[in-house]
Every structure is written in structure tokens, then in C-alpha cells.
Amino acid sequence: MTKWILMVLAWFALIAVLLYMKSYQSFSDRMQANEEKIYKTKKGNQRALVIFQDSKHGTVSKYADTVREQLLGKGYNVTVNHPRNDLNYDPMKYDLVVLLGPVYLGKPSKTFTDYISKNPFINRKIVIILVGYNPEDTRELKILEERLPNHNTVYTLKIGKEDTEQIGKIIKKATG
């Protein structure tokens, strides 16, 4: 009888863990609102597009703010929004495109991946920043890079929760 109860409890625990993990993936794959924000600088006239899919705990949003501030400091006018099917940004009108998103269960969100696949990034400087549990595992970056045409200069970074220093380095490298 005790073994049977333990087996039932183990199954309930397994189901609970799977549902918890699925909730993260569902959160990541949701379509966020169109919340375009345009930030102007008096330092220069270069343009940057920052597209970010927020994470469950707001880490990606925090990093998007860091990217925006750094780009403004380097003389870029910055447009910030979330990846959506109805966005009409022409990547060719931007000097730099920065894409930020979370990684859950070993993959980037479907919304984020679809946005990259559906947009004509040609001869652009592109920065891809993914936020995930294991920064050393960069398979997710390769998935996204493969969706971009070969005629782009792509800078990639996968980071954990508290790594704004790495963001500064990749932005500096991309804006050279």
C-alpha cells in the first residue's frame, strides 16, 4: 500500500513539474502588446532598432533598458518594441538591430524566432542577446543565427540574470 501511495505522489509531482515548465514556455511564446517607444539623442543621427521579448521575471526588459541607454550614449536614436507579426519596421532603415529574448527549456520563444524569420535582415549589423539559465550553452544562438541571411554582421551573446557588463562589451563591439 505504501509503495502505491509513493508512486501516485511521484506521478503527481512529475505532472506538477511538467505543468510548471510548460507555463514558462507559454509565457515566453505569448504575443506582447505593441509598445513602441522612440528615444532621441542630440549626440548623433544613427538609428537603432531594439526588439525584445520579455521574460517572466523581467530580466530581458531590464537588459533592453541597458542596451537603450548605451546606444543613446553612443549617439543612436533608438526605437524599442516587442516582436509582433504586425510590426512594419524596415530593418534597412536602421544602422543597428538588437534582438533580445529569453530562453526557456533550451529554446528561444516562438514569437521571437518567427519575428527573425519573417524580416528581411540584409547587410545589417545585428546583435542577438539571449538570457538563459546556462550561458555556456549557445545552441539557441545558433538556431537564431541560422534564420538570418549570410550577408549580415552578427554579434551574439547568451547571458544569465546579472550580467550587464557583458552587454556593454557586445554593444561596444557592434558600434565599434
Language model: regions and residue ranges:
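Acidic/histidine-rich, surface-exposed loop or edge segments in extracytoplasmic proteins
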Residues: 46-54
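A short, well-structured beta->alpha microelement
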Residues: 74-88
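FMN-binding flavodoxin-like domain, especially the glycine-rich phosphate-binding loop
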Residues: 2-46, 59-62, 69-74, 96-101, ...
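Histidine- and/or cysteine-centered catalytic micro-motif in compact active-site loops
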Residues: 53-54, 83, 102-103
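Glycine- and small hydrophobic-enriched segments that form the cores of compact globular domains
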Residues: 87-90, 121
